[in-house]
Amino acid sequence: MPMKIRLGMMIFSIIFILILPVSLWGQSKKLPALKQEAVQEVDKLKDFTQQMVDMIFSFGELGFQEFETSRYITTILRENGFSVEEGVSGMPTAWVARWGQGNPVIAFGSDIDCIPKASQKPGVAYHDPIIEGAPGHGEGHNSGQAVNVTAALVLKRLMEREKIAGTLMLWPGVAEEQLGAKAYFARDGVMKDVDAVLFTHVSDNLGVSFGPDSSGTGLVSVEYTFKGSSAHSAGAPWRGRSALDAVELMNIGWNFRREHLRLSQRSHYVILNGGDQPNVVPSLATVWYYFREVDYENIKKSFEIGNKIAQAAAMMTDTEVSWRILGAAWPRHFSKPIALAMYDNIKQVGLPAWSEGDQTLAKALQRELGNKETNGLKTKLTDPPRLYQGRNFGGGSDDIGDISWTAPTITLRFPSNIPDLPGHHWANAVAMATPIAHKGATAGAKVMALTTLDLLLNAKLVEQSWAYFKNEQGKETQYQSFLSAEDKPSIHLNREIMAKHRPEMRKYYFDPSKHKTYLEQLGITYPTTRESADKKTQ
């Protein structure tokens, strides 16, 4: 190659290399002003955020059946220029939405499913279901996508105007209550090109953590099916082989074994099928187990013990047993660099200004539940995140754990609910379509927007998060999925329950063209307490 050409190419390469940092440096100088503008823009969208919170609350869909919710969110995203891929990992309600070009790729996730039998009128501080026995948002999963979509729309406007490189990716936590989706996303490489994952989850404060989970577990969700042979329960019971007997013996065996397991394990089961009627020996019976532990090896051991006990129960009853994994969740590990950056933004945003009505509702609900403390909503931020040095004695699980082992991940906890509630309960739905949830979601959207700007305009933060991911988080632990290549999502779950309740629930879907809020549509005076309701009826 001639010397002049080589020299020209070298000069061009040097200039090209220099231009990118200079451009990014120029944009990063604007970061404080862009952050201030982002906060203002989120505030301008607070009515939109409120509508999303209320609409998804009114759908109240159980895991794998979140059709209305996914249709609603993806319609909004398409209308705002996002491309949407549906049916991700074989799940009809799973999707991935993208906008932008190039790196970094920032993925926003939040769960969308609800809780069985948790139907509840919002803003009412005692049990008063919208529809008796119907599902409802008794964990508050109606709020997180409103946080993410609001932040994404604000960021899109700023990125377009400022010509900021990067890609925004939004996705739903489908069937989180069944731990049914995110392990499949991880297995199938949905996050393979992602630079950082910002997940959101409802809480009673603004907060973020890093490092190994201090009070949570991973799990494997397993369905055991026993097959026997039927017979007349009175006329010829000796000719039958009871699958239900096998289920009961498995449960008894597991319950005796509990004493000899680690303190950090948690396990629970429900009998899905115990037979048809008493005078027929059950030829088929099914039990569903969650085996929880604080690390992969001990989750696997619990699963193996459960399998042995199931086989023993089958031998005792002369039945056959098979099992299949319905879902799984790895223990969570969150990114220190991103968490510290996010906490700086949390301090900048601060907690919402709660009204007297907000506090009245919170305190009344706490009294209704018999709580020792009835101090209402939090008015002080959580402490800065720090590495937990104590022992993890177990707790709940979230399949965001699997995602956290595929890319640097954090979970933003935002203040849309009331402190000290039971969880998975009608009480956790009381605040979730009220000003408490609306204000908390707006605060969360601000933190998400600010932290994403940090990642977009500070390449060093992305580099640090990956260094932590590889050198600290992955130093001694390597992710191994509980799923095989043949395992498929359990999309049959909750189908019959939703088919039963959805026709009646449709009558109560929020209509923002006629009503400003869901409270207004339902005719609820905010807040409604036992005392105020009693006065109204006198």
Where are these regions (language model features)?
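Acidic/His- and Gly-rich active-site-bordering loop/insert found
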Residues: 28-137, 146-167
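Bacterial N-terminal signal peptides that target proteins for export
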Residues: 1-12
